[in-house]
């Protein structure tokens, strides 16, 4: 009966395979015994005191303390910010707000984050693909000529910088060029989930943020899941002009941010920016050390430049890729196999965990 009633295109659709979903067992003890280096989570846990006052009441639609805290952090007015359940909800809201089912399309630049296509497919939007290209200057950059050929065919264009799973950063010039290309025909979404790993110091100019006031078709996605080490909260932010925020507010659920989430997130954004920055500095240092180590391994043929909290690398062949992956899994160290992604044959991705976790991983792989 369900197959009769369900939307036909969803019956055989493969859902997004999140890192936890791939290795979920339902056994908390087993989960805690594993080293999770496959979801780009930050290591360590914070301690937070919560108030139980008014827990019997629904939270504000958009908690003002949270919006003000993020406003101070990103130097945008509150009217330009929408708090969401992670950046993933922002992706979904954008597609639902701008794309009519079975009429409009989104554009993606693979290899890229899988939820853009999954969310589009769920909504019945078409998917146009313009793959990233390697240039003499850098890997995985935008194909601007390819993008020009798609003007008028897509309503939403997703750019990821730093990219996931590649880790590369798109230049400001490339991002601005893409915005110019689509300024009269599509919204350009710049996913900056890993932005903090590119920022050298607190208070530094946030270049892409300025584009919001310069163009009507710019949306930026941010999250507290990565550098802020709050993946379990599911708290993200969609940044754009007031008209876009007003539109998305018509589509979002009435109570998207739980009161405890807003309370913790507000405290972290107000009091713990220095803690976040120290975490970023540590992760970046470990990333560079791991990248250099990988380059010395006989089974590794390429290490991608990264400005995020992970390293993507390519093995010589599928057999060696499987040996690396399976050896780690056998010892409860989980990394991400990206080899099914376009252009990423035999590629694996390692999240930057703690210093001890990375040392354990290297020690194990040195036995190959």
Swiss-Prot record:
It catalyses: L-histidinol phosphate + 2-oxoglutarate = 3-(imidazol-4-yl)-2-oxopropyl phosphate + L-glutamate. InterPro entries: Aminotrans_II_pyridoxalP_BS, Aminotransferase_I/II_large, HisP_aminotrans, PyrdxlP-dep_Trfase, PyrdxlP-dep_Trfase_major, PyrdxlP-dep_Trfase_small. Its cofactor is pyridoxal 5'-phosphate. The modification N6-(pyridoxal phosphate)lysine is found at residue 226. It comes from Colwellia psychrerythraea (strain 34H / ATCC BAA-681). Keywords: Amino-acid biosynthesis, Aminotransferase, Histidine biosynthesis, Pyridoxal phosphate, Transferase. It holds the Pfam family Aminotran_1_2. Its EC number is 2.6.1.9. This is Histidinol-phosphate aminotransferase. Pathway: Amino-acid biosynthesis; L-histidine biosynthesis; L-histidine from 5-phospho-alpha-D-ribose 1-diphosphate: step 7/9. It is an enzyme of class 2 (transferase). One of its GO terms (molecular function) is histidinol-phosphate transaminase activity. PROSITE patterns: AA_TRANSFER_CLASS_2. PANTHER family: HISTIDINOL-PHOSPHATE AMINOTRANSFERASE, HISTIDINOL-PHOSPHATE AMINOTRANSFERASE-RELATED. Homodimer. One of its GO terms (biological process) is L-histidine biosynthetic process. It comes from the Bacteria. Belongs to the class-II pyridoxal-phosphate-dependent aminotransferase family. Histidinol-phosphate aminotransferase subfamily.
């Amino acid at each position: 009966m369900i197959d009769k009633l369900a939307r036909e295109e969803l019956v055989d659709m493969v859902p997004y395979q999140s890192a936890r979903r791939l290795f979920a067992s339902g056994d908390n003890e087993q989960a805690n015994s594993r080293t999770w280096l496959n979801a780009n989570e930050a290591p360590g846990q914070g301690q937070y005191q919560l108030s139980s006052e008014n827990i019997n009441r629904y939270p504000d639609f958009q908690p003002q303390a949270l919006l003000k805290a993020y406003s101070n952090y990103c130097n945008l007015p509150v009217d330009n910010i929408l708090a969401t359940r992670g950046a993933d909800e922002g992706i979904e809201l954008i597609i639902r707000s701008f794309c009519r089912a079975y009429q409009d399309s989104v554009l993606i630049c693979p290899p890229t984050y899988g939820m853009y296509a999954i969310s589009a497919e769920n909504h019945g939007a078409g998917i146009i693909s313009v793959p990233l290209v390697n240039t003499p200057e850098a890997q995985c950059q935008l194909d601007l000529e390819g993008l020009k050929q798609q003007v008028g065919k897509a309503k939403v264009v997703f750019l990821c910088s730093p990219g996931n799973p590649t880790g590369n950063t798109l230049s400001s010039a490339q991002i601005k060029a893409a915005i110019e290309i689509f300024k009269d025909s599509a919204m350009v979404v710049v996913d900056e989930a890993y932005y903090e790993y590119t920022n050298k110091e607190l208070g530094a100019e946030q270049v892409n943020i300025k584009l919001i006031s310069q163009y009507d078709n710019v949306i930026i996605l941010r999250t507290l899941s990565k550098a802020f080490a709050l993946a379990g909260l599911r708290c993200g932010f969609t940044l754009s002009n007031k008209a876009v925020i007003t539109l998305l507010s018509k589509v979002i659920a009435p109570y998207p941010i739980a009161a405890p989430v807003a309370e913790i997130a507000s405290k972290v954004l107000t009091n713990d920016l220095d803690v976040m920055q120290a975490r970023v500095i540590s992760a970046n240092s470990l990333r560079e050390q791991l990248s250099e180590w990988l380059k010395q391994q006989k089974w590794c043929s390429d290490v991608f430049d990264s400005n995020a909290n992970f390293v993507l690398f390519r093995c010589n062949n599928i057999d060696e890729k499987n040996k690396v992956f399976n050896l780690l899994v056998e010892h409860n160290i989980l990394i991400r196999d990206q080899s099914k992604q376009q252009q990423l044959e035999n590629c694996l991705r390692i999240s930057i965990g703690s210093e001890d976790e990375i040392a354990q991983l290297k020690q194990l792989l040195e036995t190959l």
